Amino acid sequence: MSHIPISNTIPPKQTDGNGKANISPDKLDPKVSIDMEAPEFKDFAKTMVDFIAEYLENIRDRRVLPEVKPGYLKPLIPDAAPEKPEKWQDVMQDIERVIMPGVTHWHSPKFHAYFPTANSYPAIVADMLSGAIACIGFTWIASPACTELEVVMMDWLGKMLELPAEFLVCSGGKGGGVIQGTASESTLVALLGAKAKKLKEVKELHPEWDEHTILGKLVGYCSDQAHSSVERAGLLGGVKLRSVQSENHRMRGAALEKAIEQDLAEGLIPFYAVVTLGTTNSCAFDYLDECGPVGNKHNLWIHVDAAYAGSAFICPEYRHLMKGIESADSFNFNPHKWMLVNFDCSAMWLKDPSWVVNAFNVDPLYLKHDMQGSAPDYRHWQIPLGRRFRALKLWFVLRLYGVENLQAHIRRHCNFAKQFGDLCVADSRFELAAEINMGLVCFRLKGSNERNEALLKRINGRGHIHLVPAKIKDVYFLRMAICSRFTQSEDMEYSWKEVSAAADEMEQEQ
């Protein structure tokens, strides 16, 4: 075997002409700062705040969809990081030159794709403070305020929605809330908790069965209109998920029960069902008051996914859509979609968090602390270990808007959707593809799917507004979502004119 020679000699220092070590002073002198100093930070931050305010207040004037092609950005910046620090003024100049040409402006009143992602000045300021505190709140002791504010904010939010007391810490029971990153995470966390719960129950009934056998029999359920993240949760959780055929885009209790009984007859073990309140395709609402009791009867974990529509439940007139919530084991919605709280902030409540906590509990010595058990360690409630101080955003928004103004925001968006729907049905060329729910209008040109595909391509190609499509039972349609907090009635008229003009162009070319 060959050996690599090892030298025990210390390489000679580089010296100047006088024999002194030639080392630059800034690498030795602890008094020399390599950081941006506070006065410079203040100037930089003030300039950025001015830029943000100018950007948002005038966002309507920007083309909503960028015209760049993949790879546009690389030629605009150097191939490697700079050796020496640059001036922050140069960075500011590059925002318009490098970044803005490739930004899709989600907060423009002309952006109608997907569902909204929330944005507000109080939330932006809260994120500044969160970034400054820069704690990683995986345990209570890692930053007590981070954990304790989250506990209180989740109770505030739960009370605003009038969730059953069993979900709230203030009830004194087992329940509680946690801020996840996304609804997708919440769905997966609930599935893994349900999986652990059912595994324990079946092992007690059949101690002779091994874990692999039990896991192979587990089956969960969701509507055929459920979000793709539900299917993905099944893949990540290693369990079968069965799609239940919907009726008018909504899952009924009878259909769920039929699917459960079929699987029981085949020797499978039903354990979990997702009930969607506000589907992505058409904002349809599964019958929670039917599906929940069916799940309870068969001892399934019922998870309610209200990612978009859940914000509307702060308005009393929409709470009938969550009828049956008392039958749920977990409930989730995204304040970062429609409640003016910047991404990411996904609110999740569990009636009995212990199933999730025990399923995720890995407790190394370096994460233990003397107060364990006296307050939640949220690392046990989620997939990642680390977590940001997201409760600050909720606290700022709820205090600086108040419930009344948040309700007004929701109602305005719902009214704008009705306005657009009225404009649509007044044109004999168009039809609604689904009932108008919340801030979403599903519409189409009468005729073939191909005509509607061509219409959407033309609308987005014009670049003045941005929409995305959906398809239900082989019917292709366009989705008009009200997304921006800056939206006014005039914006809905403008967006309709864009749709109508695109249809006119198609007719003229025929």
Swiss-Prot record:
Catalytic activity: L-dopa + H(+) = dopamine + CO2; 5-hydroxy-L-tryptophan + H(+) = serotonin + CO2
Binding site for pyridoxal 5'-phosphate: A183, S184, H227, D305, N334
Assembly notes: Homodimer.
One BP term from GO: wing disc development
UniProt-annotated stretches for the region Disordered: 1-29, 358-384
Any one GO molecular-function label of the UniProt entry: 5-hydroxy-L-tryptophan decarboxylase activity
Names of required cofactors: pyridoxal 5'-phosphate
Source organism (scientific name): Drosophila simulans (Fruit fly)
Transmembrane stretches, start-end: none
Name the record gives this protein: Aromatic-L-amino-acid decarboxylase
Annotated Gene Ontology cellular component terms: cytoplasm
InterPro entries (alphabetical): Aromatic_deC, PyrdxlP-dep_de-COase, PyrdxlP-dep_Trfase, PyrdxlP-dep_Trfase_major, PyrdxlP-dep_Trfase_small, Pyridoxal-P_BS
Lineage, opening ranks: Eukaryota, Metazoa, Ecdysozoa, Arthropoda, Hexapoda
